[in-house]
């Protein structure tokens, strides 16, 4: 393989056991907190599989592992909130990706429940912004489900804060160039 006149490494893996996780660790992504349910049924998880699908009408796509506690609540409730995390919220991202993540009524210690235009939206103080979404469709993706969410509410967050980014297995902020 030639790239810009130089020889590139050709360690090509073509087996079905391709380590997709190793590949995806190289792709920097933003980090979000997904919440769903209320009261004792409330559940949350850290998420970085988030895609903007359309602007009109506003829709997002998320990927949720079927074996997660949050998946069962999410598919039963049919709605969710997404909060984009700021750079200083790395400890929260780690907490909500752990097995000991808070749920039920304890989730109220971290997020504020708002009802805007008749829709619930959990807002994480200090986050970049929040969305309240209704599940419009669920697509089977083997060990995950892809959920298409119709955005019903947007709540602005911390003005001027930098995003939390996940890259190479680490959480951090961004560096601006130029």
Q: Model-predicted segments: where are they?
A:
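Basic, polyanion-binding surface patches
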Residues: 2-178
């Amino acid at each position: 393989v030639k790239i810009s006149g130089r020889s590139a490494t050709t360690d090509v893996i073509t087996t079905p056991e391709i380590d997709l996780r190793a590949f995806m660790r190289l792709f920097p992504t933003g980090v979000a907190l997904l919440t769903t349910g209320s009261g004792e049924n409330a559940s949350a998880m850290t998420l970085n599989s988030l895609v903007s699908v359309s602007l009109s009408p506003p829709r997002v796509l998320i990927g949720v592992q079927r074996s997660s506690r949050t998946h069962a609540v999410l598919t039963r409730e049919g709605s969710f909130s997404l909060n984009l995390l700021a750079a200083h919220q790395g400890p929260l991202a780690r907490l909500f990706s752990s097995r000991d993540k808070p749920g039920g009524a304890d989730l109220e210690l971290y997020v504020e429940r708002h009802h805007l235009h008749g829709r619930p939206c959990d807002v994480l103080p200090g986050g970049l912004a929040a969305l309240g979404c209704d599940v419009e469709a669920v697509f089977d993706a083997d060990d995950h489900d892809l959920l298409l969410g119709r955005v019903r509410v947007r709540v602005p967050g911390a003005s001027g804060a930098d995003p939390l980014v996940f890259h190479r297995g680490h959480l951090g902020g961004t560096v601006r160039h130029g």
